[in-house]
């Protein structure tokens, strides 16, 4: 067994600058949603579809651009998972207006649990690094599930909440959405915003660590392309990913997680441990080498390569997280939707 896998196994036994909203990109989120879709019975699919037709952007986004060979039910349900990213403002050239972007809630996509570089533990001892009162993904998931369960919630609000549940269960399984790396340098004394300020190279390409993990299941760099052709292509890519993962056999440790870890907090804790053990670690178990990267702007040329071992391990980790997200989300939806 390699040093890296020994280190990961050991970890498995443990159980105001805006942050980028994306976790898995559109391909990853829709792959989760497709796995969910295939696990729901016809009754739950019908409930979901009926509810989604009350969504304020049903015609404009959820049902838009559907290919002839995909049912409206499947198309709309799978696309719920990316609506919370679609409403994100796109800058000065965004012509969609407040009718779309007012639904954007960037703080709901993540939780910044501090991961302190072990060599600097004494420096940060006893310090409060993250405001405990900040709204985060755990609060958002609890609130959205309650909205769907509550009989007096209007259907339009339930439809919006369903989209958030689909999306955030995917987000919470992305390790870099559950962490902020700290060390005693001027660049990371306030954290790296979940890898958004941490530059590396992967396969020769400079990339922020957060973005690298976002794109592990497939690249959707042109996320603002709303054309029917582009949306159909991303949908097909997501279905390919879902098909490739459908037969993935989870290891005993992952099966145990499915049985034992049933709360949003436990899912987030899993992701945090993986961020520490895999996301920010080299193949020898040392802290991953990176360079400080600006929140906006180019990543410095000095960004170091993560290496083949890191790439393989990260990909395998992402695949397992997608499968866990799909299975857990399907079961959670059955609970909140009822029979």
Predicted feature residues:
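Extreme N-terminus of proteins, especially the signal/transit-peptide cleavage junction
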Residues: 2, 19-23
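Bacterial N-terminal signal peptides that target proteins for export
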Residues: 1-8
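N-terminal, motif-rich segments that launch catalysis or mediate targeting to/interaction with membranes
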Residues: 22-168, 175-339
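Bacterial N-terminal signal peptides
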Residues: 8-18
């Amino acid at each position: 067994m390699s040093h890296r896998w020994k280190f990961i196994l050991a970890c498995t036994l443990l159980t105001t600058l805006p942050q980028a909203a994306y976790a898995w990109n559109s391909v990853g989120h829709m792959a989760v949603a497709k796995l969910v879709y295939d696990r729901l019975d016809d009754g739950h699919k019908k409930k979901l579809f009926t509810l989604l037709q009350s969504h304020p952007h049903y015609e404009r986004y959820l049902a838009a651009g559907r290919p002839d060979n995909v049912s409206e039910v499947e198309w709309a349900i799978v696309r719920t998972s990316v609506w919370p990213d679609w409403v994100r403002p796109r800058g000065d050239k965004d012509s969609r207006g407040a009718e779309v972007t007012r639904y954007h809630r960037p703080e709901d996509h993540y939780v910044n649990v501090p991961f302190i570089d072990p060599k600097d533990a004494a420096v940060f001892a006893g310090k409060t690094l993250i405001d405990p009162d900040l709204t985060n993904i755990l609060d958002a998931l609890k609130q959205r599930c309650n909205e769907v369960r509550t009989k007096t919630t209007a259907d339009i609000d339930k439809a919006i909440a369903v989209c958030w549940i689909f999306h955030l269960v995917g987000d919470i399984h992305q390790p870099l959405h559950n962490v902020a790396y700290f060390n005693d340098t001027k660049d990371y004394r306030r954290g790296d915003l979940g890898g958004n300020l941490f530059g590396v190279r992967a396969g020769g390409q400079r990339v922020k660590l957060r973005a690298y993990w976002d794109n592990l299941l497939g690249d959707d760099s042109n996320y603002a392309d709303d054309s029917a052709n582009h949306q159909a292509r991303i949908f097909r890519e997501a279905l390919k990913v879902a098909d490739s993962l459908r037969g993935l056999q989870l290891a005993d440790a992952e099966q145990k997680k499915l049985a034992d870890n049933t709360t949003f907090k436990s899912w987030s804790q899993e992701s945090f441990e993986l961020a520490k053990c895999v996301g920010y670690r080299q193949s020898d178990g040392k802290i991953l080498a990176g360079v400080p990267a600006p929140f906006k702007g180019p990543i410095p040329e000095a960004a170091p390569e993560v290496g083949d071992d890191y790439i393989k391990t990260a990909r395998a980790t992402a695949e397992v997280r997608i499968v866990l997200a799909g299975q857990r989300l399907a079961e959670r939806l059955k609970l909140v939707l009822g029979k």
